[in-house]
Amino acid sequence: MARLRVYELARQLEMDTRELMKELHELGIEIKSHMSYIDEETVNLLLEMYGTQEEEEELIEEYEEYEEIDEEVNGKHFKNKEGSLEKLQTNKKKNSVKITEEDLKLDKFAEKIGIPQNKIIQDFFMKGEILKPGQSLNLQLAKKIAKMYDVRISFENEEKEEVIENPLIEIEKYFEEKYKNPENLKERPPVVTVMGHVDHGKTTLLDYIRNTRVAEREEGGITQSIGAYQVEVNGKKITFIDTPGHEIFTEMRARGAQATDIVVLVVAADDGVMPQTIEAYNHAKSANVPIIVAINKIDKPNANVEKTKQELVNKLNLIPEEWGGDTIVVPISAKKGQNVDTLLEMILLVAEMQEIKGIPDGPVRAVTIESKLDKGFGPVANVIVKDGILKIGDYIISGKVMGKVKALVNDQGKRVKEAGPSTPVMIVGFEELPDSHGIVYSVDSLDKAREISEKIREIEQKELRRKRHMKLEEILKMMEQSERKELRLVLKADTQGSLMALSGAINKLRSEEISINIIHSGVGSITVSDVMLATASDAIILGFRVKADSQARKMAEAEGIQIKTYTIVYKLIEELQAALEGMLEPEEIEEITGRGEIKKVFKIKKVGSIAGVQMIEGYVEKDGLVKVYRSGKLVYEGKIESLKHYQQDVKRVDAPQECGIKLENFDDIKEGDELEFSVLKKVARKLTFEEDKGEK
């Protein structure tokens, strides 16, 4: 039977084309449409599985003709390549088993299909493939195992419940489409977060800018703490998030609510780069936000600006512009205000270079800095508008919480009618307290807000029991489906020496297909900040001779972040290496298994030429490869279509036995031809430790 198109085979099988396509997909046979071709081997298999009575009789007739042949090898007949008459007559469909995601473990899968796990492992080992007890299976491998034992499987979700699409996705798509057209965008003020080590002057800097730059308040006005404020510099505005540090920054990132456009990293000139400086830098770098360094406390007698710059280079790889790099570094005194104006000008310069823009009108998207219950206003949210114009009377939604804007209060405590991009305001009018660090959207009507709210609540209820971040094994499984394979780590150790040794060893696990990105490393116990960063970056946390503090453990458990701790270096490296090696595509090698010689050629109608082979050495496998040599020259290289010993289909024949072999798509065989048999084996690849080549 030649190859056929899907619809042609469906016609022969008297099946609906769509039904056949579904069956093919379940069998793991890739087809694109009803016009796709199916190869000859698959056609024959499907005819045997689903064949009509007419085809069955044809196969039986072929079998009987095959049995009548007088030519023998060692006095025995060959049989039909697909097995016994009984098999042809029964022609039963394969057993069908439904599996769920929970069944994709070798032990559970084996139980499901009724085959002992040890037998599966042994059979695959004989084919040159290694399976381990209880190992995770992807759907492709599960189908391969099922096919080996004539079992059909179909995949179904364990929970047969309606999938509810998050309505906020559609709202986000609106903004995505708007951003694709530059004509829809307009320059907006940059939003700045100030980060740095404790006591390096973050709060002092923010207070100085606020006190000297915020516009004069009207008599009787009060300062309203809404988590951010705006200043004006040379006719342009800058919005500062009023809570210094990277905690809020990272929490917002973890919720997909990135508000920061520029980070000012404060480093004290008398103290240099400290652990929290490195931590803050890693948070900013992970978010791909531009960094300006403010070297503070230059008024101190022991201030050393040049030494601090050198530490920026050595510890953070931040090279100042004046040293040939691209990092803007401004020496300042936040206490005395020295060079703070220059810092503000540099912020505007970076903003101009970054082309920070937003949608100036229409529906609103705003980032929540914090939410709280106000004694006078009830549930309120302090936000920075990212896009659109927020107005009194707008219907709003933040996650599952809805509301209607009753009042807007700016950073000067004044009520305003509207707020545009990058403007910080307090929203009054939520029905209940919205989540901090979420996103607020405006919608057309109260009904729309209520509809979204109800759907989000339903989604959250369903996700609550399934909510978890990726474990190491799941990250690797995801990477298997991705072209770019990157494993992100947060690394903590007991000493700087241990940290350097571990970082060096991990970075030497090299592969073109998989990279390890240590997004943050530090000395000391695993903290809430580490968990927040891992949450925002889908990373796992590795600790060496350190523990996670109680708050970090609670947060990790709530967020589903995996923390793995070790006390022996090689155990950490060994486990990481083993996990990564499991992700490498195995190497395929050809291994010669034996040699044989054709003693007799049998011509069989509708089947072709069968080689009567005397095995000389080694063995031959049914699913193996073969090369045919005639007078020392290669005349054929391909696959073995069928292998028989006496009248039985067999998987393997060893020397010095005789056997019958049918070659795939090749009948021009002659007595005296020499055969070389081989198999393709998949060999697990190893990651190797390499010497750094000029890297630091």
Curated annotation (Swiss-Prot):
The positions annotated for binding GTP are 196-203, 242-246, 296-299
Residue numbers spanned by region G4: 296-299
The segment annotated G2 runs over 221-225
Q: Which Gene3D superfamilies match?
A: 1.10.10.2480, P-loop containing nucleotide triphosphate hydrolases, Translation factors, Translation initiation factor IF- 2, domain 3
Domain (tr-type G) spans 187-361
Note down the stretches annotated as region G1: 196-203
Residue segments, region G3: 242-245
Q: Name one GO molecular function term.
A: GTPase activity
Where in or outside the cell it occurs: the entry states: Cytoplasm
PROSITE patterns xrefs: G_TR_2 (PS51722)
Query: Signal peptide location in the record?
Result: none
Residues passing through the membrane, by range: none
Origin superkingdom: Bacteria
Q: Which NCBIfam families match?
A: IF-2, small_GTP
Give the UniProt family note.
Belongs to the TRAFAC class translation factor GTPase superfamily. Classic translation factor GTPase family. IF-2 subfamily.
PANTHER family per record:
TR-TYPE G DOMAIN-CONTAINING PROTEIN, TRANSLATION INITIATION FACTOR IF-2-RELATED
Q: What does this protein do?
A: One of the essential components for the initiation of protein synthesis. Protects formylmethionyl-tRNA from spontaneous hydrolysis and promotes its binding to the 30S ribosomal subunits. Also involved in the hydrolysis of GTP during the formation of the 70S ribosomal complex.
Stated name of the protein: Translation initiation factor IF-2
Native organism is: Thermosipho africanus (strain TCF52B)
